[in-house]
Amino acid sequence: MTPAQRKFLKIVKDEHYFDKDSKILLALSGGKDSMTLFNWLYDLKEVLGIELGLAHINHGLREESKFEEIALREMATKLKVPIYVDKFTGEFTEKNARDFRYQFFEKLMIGENYNILLTAHHQGDLVETVLMRQITGRPLRSLQGIADRQPFAGGQLIRPLLKFTKEELDAQTYYEDSTNQGLDYFRNRIRNQLIPELKKENPQFSQSISDLSSEIKKALAVINQKISELEIVDEKISSKKFISQTKELQHFILQAFFAQYPEIEVSKKKFAELLHIINRPQQYFAKLNKEFYFVKTKDFFYLEKIQLERENSVEIVSENPQDESFMEVYLPLEGEIEIRKRQPGDQILINGHHKKLRKFFIDNKVPLKARENPLIFVDKKLYAIVGLACSDLSKMLKNDKIRRILWVKPSIGEEINDARKKS
């Protein structure tokens, strides 16, 4: 057993990466990193008591790719190790290729009953990732670098080589990807231009960044402990508990909150605005992006998924449905009907007075969700807030024989119907 293999075996056991009888799928590119990991796993499979399979993606970017695929298939057959191969299709970008790989791995994990996925990311990959995120202005949380383990496809994704430098990886047979030497990609420029220059200033630069990443993880663990003490119910955070924290801790709590939603990008300006909103006593309900609303009630703040029907959330019939959930709206016989969401400056004529909708909602304690109900206009004049109230313009037509009648109701739940009863 080589010194590197002994180090690997110790890390696997100390970190409890997997148990005996684990069924492991190794992402095998054919490069030095993944071939080293394969060699170590294959040599130690009896000691570890594992079952091993290989997953390879042919990205088709180089002429050599097809020959490398053939060689890997032949190696796996000779060593009696299952290998699964797929070929990337579609427009090549780093993100598209990554998404394709992990979708393939997920399908194999589930379909072939693997419980561990291993990738061969090493210390150099971690350092590159930290630098890329730092250069692009990512928050402190992202500077932890690459996690050594995380849930994946009902099992675990584990990266057991993060404590190894590139120089420690000892595979003798591997396939060099010539595209890694170019400067077309951001990561390549970091790897091939920036890091070599930084190592001239500090030969231990990579280890220093790795240590910094570890320090950040420890600091965030303390913050996460504080977060766990907050009142969190169904992914809703207590506004009162949040406001009682220091401004500095509030910043990191809100960062952690949004980290639960990796698909959401919040600008620094928007982040600061939301911090301010949470600390104000007023309620808040607004679209954060195309998929989520940010909601703050007097008790909690949280994100709510935007349902497609909210954009056109009204059911309309022209004959009495004999259903109390419908609201009767009287409209003039002539004029263009418009149904839309509220806009700044909208007013309603109610009880003989023109009142801005914002004030109407506040005065009647209308729930935030209900404030998004559609409005019914005729020739730019507001006749009804669906599910909530009719304006005087509509009420004046009740006994008029020349009129139109619509029966309408919102299609977004009981909370709005309750709001109508209160107003």
Curated annotation (Swiss-Prot):
The keyword Nucleotide-binding applies. It is an enzyme of class 6 (ligase). It catalyses: cytidine(34) in tRNA(Ile2) + L-lysine + ATP = lysidine(34) in tRNA(Ile2) + AMP + diphosphate + H(+). One of its GO terms (biological process) is tRNA modification. Its main location: cytoplasm. The N-terminal region contains the highly conserved SGGXDS motif, predicted to be a P-loop motif involved in ATP binding. Ligates lysine onto the cytidine present at position 34 of the AUA codon-specific tRNA(Ile) that contains the anticodon CAU, in an ATP-dependent manner. Cytidine is converted to lysidine, thus changing the amino acid specificity of the tRNA from methionine to isoleucine. Signal peptide: none annotated. InterPro entries: Lysidine-tRNA-synth_C, Rossmann-like_a/b/a_fold, TilS/TtcA_N, tRNA_Ile_lys_synt, tRNA_Ile_lys_synt_N. It is found in: Cytoplasm. This is tRNA(Ile)-lysidine synthase. Gene3D superfamilies: HUPs. Its EC number is 6.3.4.19. The gene is tilS.
